[in-house]
A protein has these predicted regions:
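Intramolecular chaperone/auto-protease modules of tailspike-like proteins
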Residues: 4-117
């Protein structure tokens, strides 16, 4: 397994999630879906496996709906390259460990609010 550096001495601007970020995280927790990769369906047909995950475009929209830019967060990725035909291509993605941490922050905030009642 990979160890993620988490040393306070290597971080700055350490803060709790804002209300808008917590709203995004709550929304993201509802967006997980099952799907099949198109290239695997083309290769394997009905034998292509089903996966569980989130759609990066929906992640991007959830941030936008709260007035935030997903590209400012490490959980969201956007890679652009030029294909063999000279056309620019973009692929969006997520870093699941960061996504799960982000979502966990909203769960913890909701539990804390419930405990306070």
């Amino acid at each position: 397994s990979t160890i993620q550096t988490s040393d306070q001495n290597e971080k700055q601007d350490i803060a709790s999630a804002t209300a808008k970020e917590l709203n995004v995280a709550k929304k993201l927790s509802t967006l997980f879906k099952t799907f099949k990769w198109k290239d695997k369906v083309a290769e394997k047909g009905d034998k292509a496996r089903t996966h569980t995950g989130i759609v990066a475009q929906e992640v991007q929209l959830a941030f936008k709906e709260e007035g935030l830019d997903a590209s400012n967060y490490g959980l969201f990725t956007s890679d652009t390259w030029t294909n063999d035909d000279g056309k620019e291509q973009t692929r969006l993605g997520v870093r699941y460990p960061e996504l799960f941490s982000f979502i966990f922050s909203s769960i913890e905030a909701r539990l804390t609010a419930l405990d306070a009642k």
